[in-house]
C-alpha cells in the first residue's frame, strides 16, 4: 500500500502544510499544463497532479490517504458517518440493500452522502463569443483579434479575496475544519452530526477584511484579448474551442475554455453549400446558341469556360477544385456555373431585322409588331 505517491507527485513530504501543498500544486500544475507543455505524457502528468491535490487539499481525505492509501482517499475504508458504512461494499453501498436507511438518516441528520470538498480546485466557467466573417474570410481563413471580458484572479489580492496587507484567517467557528457539529432531536433521540460551516462555507478560512477591488470574491472582470486563427473552410454555426481562455478557476483550478462561434456573411455573387460553390451566370442568347468561351469569376480568380452551342437555361458546368477548402479532409470542393440565358429587351433596327431573318429561315412566323395581344390585357 503506497500512501506517499500523491506527495511525490507534488514534490512535498508527508508533513507539508496546506500552504506548501497549494504552492507546490500551482507549480506542478503550471509545469504540466497542456497549454504550456506540449511534451508527450504532459497531459497525463497534469491529471495526476490534479488528482493528488484534490485529495491532499482536503484534510479528511488526506487523513484517510495517509492511513489507507489511495483506497482510503476514494472511500474504500472508513470515513462513513456511522462506523464507516461506506466500506461495506458487500451490501451494495449507499445504493444497495440499505439505501432506505441512508434516506432516513439523511432526513434526520442533514446529510449522509459524499460531500464536495470546497477547497478542491475547480475549473472556471466556459465562455462563448461570436465572430462575424466575410464570405472570402471563411473560404481562405483569417486571423482575428477577439476582445471580451472574462473573470481573472484579482490583481490586488492575487485571488485570496483579502484586503491588501491581510490574509484569510482560520475560521473562528469551525477551527479550519470546514465542518461544525450540530445536535438535533430525532425520533431516535438526540444525535450529533456534522454539517458545512455556515461562516466559511466549508473552506476553513474566514476573510475578515475583504479586498476593496473584488470584495472578497478573489476574481475581477478584465478585458482580455486573444488571437484566433480561423481555419479555411469554416461555415456558419461551427465552433472552435480555445482551451484556457475562459473564466479563472477556483482554488487554483485551471481556466475554463472559450468557444468561438462563426457567423459567415452571404455573398452577393456566390452561393455556398459546404465545400461546393454555385455561381449563376447571365448569358446572351446568341452566345448560348452559337457557343462561346467566356470568363467566369471564382473565389480563386477568373477562369475560362467553353460554352457549347445550343446551351439552355439551367445547364450547369463544373469547375473542379474551384470551390471552398474541405475543412475535414484535403483539397477543395468544386464550383458549379449555372447558365441563365438573358433575352434582350431593347434592340435596334439592325438587330430586329437579323432576328426576323433568322425566324424566316427557321420557318417561324413572328408579327414583330410589339403590340399587346388580346390576352395580354389580362396579365
UniProtKB/Swiss-Prot annotation:
Function (record text): Participates actively in the response to hyperosmotic and heat shock by preventing the aggregation of stress-denatured proteins and by disaggregating proteins, also in an autonomous, DnaK-independent fashion. Unfolded proteins bind initially to DnaJ; upon interaction with the DnaJ-bound protein, DnaK hydrolyzes its bound ATP, resulting in the formation of a stable complex. GrpE releases ADP from DnaK; ATP binding to DnaK triggers the release of the substrate protein, thus completing the reaction cycle.
Segments forming a coiled coil: none
Name listed for the protein in its UniProt record: Chaperone protein DnaJ
Cofactor(s) the protein requires to work: Zn(2+)
Residues given in the record as Zn(2+) 2 binding sites: 171, 174, 197, 200
InterPro entries: DnaJ, DnaJ_C, DnaJ_domain, DnaJ_domain_CS, HSP40/DnaJ_pept-bd, HSP_DnaJ_Cys-rich_dom, HSP_DnaJ_Cys-rich_dom_sf, J_dom_sf
Subcellular location: Cytoplasm
Organism, scientific name: Lactococcus lactis subsp. cremoris (strain SK11)
Free-text remark on how the cofactor is bound: Binds 2 Zn(2+) ions per monomer.
SUPFAM superfamilies named among the record's database cross-references: Chaperone J-domain, DnaJ/Hsp40 cysteine-rich domain, HSP40/DnaJ peptide-binding domain
Subcellular location, principal: cytoplasm
Recorded GO CC terms: cytoplasm
Domain J: 5-69
GO BP term, example: response to heat
